[in-house]
Amino acid sequence: IKNVARRVKSEVDAGNQVAVVVSAMSGKTNELVGWAQEVSPMYDAREYDVIVSSGEQVTVGLLAMALQSMDVPARSWLGWQIPIKTDGAHAKARIKEIDTTELDKRLNGGEVVCVAGFQGIAPDNRITTLGRGGSDTSAVALAAALDADRCDIYTDVDGVYTTDPRI
């Protein structure tokens, strides 16, 4: 988290407006999925989304706190707060619209907006998740909605593989 915060701070120090989309920490989503399956192998998809989206919520709060500790104005945002509007397909939702009104105000005011990736809000106001890789999808969609000059995606994996390295 502190490494990410330092990278974000360098962008801010260079005069850039920065929106950061985060994923859950490595292994956390799998842990949360395991908890859901342990409680109920036939779980409700809506409750599944509430559980697995919590990994991003922790990460985004920690990043905002790390930035604030470096004197970088920052605030965390969850998908429903923005809102990132999706269809109602829980665990595999698709982004329909992102209202950037409040984020634009914050960015123009010099604040770093830290967004929890992988999640949005369904038409019935329930949390949705976008499926695996959803944080990258969130980052690209948010960059497009904000008309960003660029979208940089960083990851904590060792490299790019053409096959599953665990085989």
How should these model regions be labeled?
Residues 1-167:
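Nucleotide/pyrophosphate-binding catalytic subdomain
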